[in-house]
């Protein structure tokens, strides 16, 4: 599938996910006679197709509706009732059940559902959809009073409002709200973008999986692939969907996205970007969509492509926060210095409102009993960052691997533990609770003790029984809850701009502004000459010609 005009690949993926989530379950006309079902889907198909070019995702979406209504493609195509006449028939569908009988109105439902599908497939705004509705009403010769009622109903689909639908939609309103209202409200939510950056072997994949509560990033991802993985939170539709971009082609959505699918995408070097959408555990907001972007782990000496892909993404994608992971075992490296300086120069200095927070991972490698000084190590890290130009850097130490094991136990996934992981779980649990290793006490320029998740009950791991409440407290001690709280607070207080800009867009705006000022100066000189020489002899026209030539040359050089 090629990129739609005006949409980024990320927007196109989100649009495809919305169409994929159109399951048409609980459709009101599903219980009617087959001839009414055929008429309904035929009219809907013709209305939708009248507005859109052929699209494989839309075709797949309409195919699901045929399956739900138990109508074949041949039966749909054979229905040739004219649209005005067909809509009139749908306004008075006879039904009977037992000793009851009467008429049902599906005319309004067909019109609204057609416009909703067009709006999702074309990524239309509410205003554009209302214009499409007006066009459909004109085609179907619908009365103006009904058209106004349907237009008013669209406001309800986009915003959470209390309203009483007109009698034409009374029986269908709950389906429309369940099917489309949730989709459009999710689509309209602002997005808070977080990029995760690190050099090789910082434990970035483990950190992302422990933060989000599932194995979204295959183990060893940073060492073998130069791709971006973007994961969007969707609390309304928790089922995980995914698709990938191979070169300049966006592939259709896949569901369910299994670990095997992720591994296949990860090992394919032609895939440049993976898009995922599902319910992220422990982070997020109902008012804003959190999107986490995993960038390739960089190592400029081994694979410069990883570094290039990371910087290209950071420069050309609007970001609200960057989380930078440092390996506690190797904090001061040339690769770290190179990447951090580029991030500062190309992102933070260009878009100062972008927030950056530093995590020192793999702190569990420290042997405090043998004299390893965690406090001094973190102080040194802060000083090194300040020398690179990061004023009062916020530094949070974390044990991402321990956090991943604790989260798995809390989520009932302890049966997936290997023998080695069971032993490591016991060791981490002992260090956090019995030896009082609380990493939240070692934070620099930030104070986030972290909120332990609520948990009850117990779990058996190996030969030991663990209280889940204590596991939750051990999870808090790893520092991962502090990171989650940091993101939650940022997301909840996020006030989006009209259109957040990437560093590249900001630079282009600055360049355009500078050029326009220079052009204004040239035009001002020209205006002044005209005022001073309006009554001068014709010989002065040569100076005028020279000024015009200068202006033409400038426009040619800067076009």
Task: Please annotate each region the language model reported.
Residues 7-15, 177-437, 457, 468, ...:
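Globular "head" domains of long coiled-coil molecular machines
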Residues 2-201, 214-281, 346, 371, ...:
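N-terminal low-complexity/disordered regulatory or targeting extensions
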Residues 410-559:
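P-loop NTP-binding site
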């Amino acid at each position: 599938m090629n990129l739609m005009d005006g949409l980024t690949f990320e927007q196109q993926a989100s649009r495809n996910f919305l169409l994929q989530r159109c399951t048409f379950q609980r459709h009101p006309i599903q219980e009617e006679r087959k001839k009414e079902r055929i008429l309904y889907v035929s009219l809907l198909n013709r209305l939708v197709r009248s507005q859109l070019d052929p699209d494989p995702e839309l075709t797949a979406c309409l195919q699901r509706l045929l399956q739900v209504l138990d109508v074949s493609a041949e039966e749909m195509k054979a229905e040739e009732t004219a649209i005005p006449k067909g809509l009139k028939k749908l306004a008075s569908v006879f039904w009977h059940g037992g000793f009851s009988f009467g008429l049902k109105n599906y005319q309004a439902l067909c019109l609204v559902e057609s416009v909703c599908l067009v709006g999702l497939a074309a990524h239309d705004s509410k205003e554009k959809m209302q214009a499409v509705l007006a066009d459909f009403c004109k085609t179907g010769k619908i009365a103006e009073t009904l058209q106004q009622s349907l237009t008013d109903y669209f406001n309800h689909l986009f915003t959470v409002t209390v309203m009483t639908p007109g009698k034409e939609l009374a029986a269908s309103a709950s389906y429309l709200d369940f099917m489309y209202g949730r989709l459009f409200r999710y689509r309209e939510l602002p997005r808070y973008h977080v990029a995760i950056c690190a050099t090789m072997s910082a434990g970035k994949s483990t950190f992302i999986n422990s933060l989000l509560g599932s194995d979204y990033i295959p183990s060893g991802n940073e060492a073998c692939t130069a791709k971006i993985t973007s994961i969007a939170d969707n609390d309304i539709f928790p089922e995980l969907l995914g698709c990938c971009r191979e070169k300049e082609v966006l592939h259709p959505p896949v569901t369910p996205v299994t670990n095997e699918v992720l591994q296949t995408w990860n090992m394919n070097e032609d895939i440049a970007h993976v898009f995922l959408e599902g319910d992220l555990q422990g982070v997020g907001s109902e008012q804003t969509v959190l999107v986490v972007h995993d960038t390739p782990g960089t190592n400029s000496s081994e694979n410069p492509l990883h570094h290039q892909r990371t910087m290209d993404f950071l420069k050309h994608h609007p970001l609200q926060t960057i989380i930078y992971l440092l390996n506690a075992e190797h904090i001061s490296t040339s690769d770290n210095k190179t990447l951090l300086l580029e991030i500062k120069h190309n992102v933070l200095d260009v878009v100062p409102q972008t927030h950056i927070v530093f995590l020192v991972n793999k702190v569990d490698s420290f042997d405090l009993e043998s004299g390893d000084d965690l406090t001094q190590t973190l102080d040194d890290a802060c000083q090194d960052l300040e020398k690179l130009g990061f004023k009062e850097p916020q530094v949070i130490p974390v044990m991402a691997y321990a956090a991943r094991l604790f989260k798995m136990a809390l989520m009932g996934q302890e049966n997936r533990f290997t023998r080695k992981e069971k032993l490591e779980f016991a060791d981490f649990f002992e260090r956090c609770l019995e030896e009082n290793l609380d990493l939240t006490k070692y934070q620099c320029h930030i104070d986030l003790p972290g909120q332990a998740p609520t948990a009850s009950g117990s779990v058996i791991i190996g030969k030991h029984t663990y209280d889940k409440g204590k596991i939750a407290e051990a999870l808090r001690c790893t520092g991962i809850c502090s990171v989650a709280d940091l993101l939650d607070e940022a997301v909840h207080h996020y006030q989006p701009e009209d259109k957040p800009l990437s560093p590249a867009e900001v630079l282009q705006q600055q360049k355009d502004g500078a050029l326009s000022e220079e052009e204004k100066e040239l035009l001002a000189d020209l205006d002044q000459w005209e005022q001073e020489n309006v009554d001068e002899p014709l010989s002065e026209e040569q100076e005028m010609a020279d000024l015009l030539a200068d202006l033409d040359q400038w426009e040619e050089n800067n076009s």
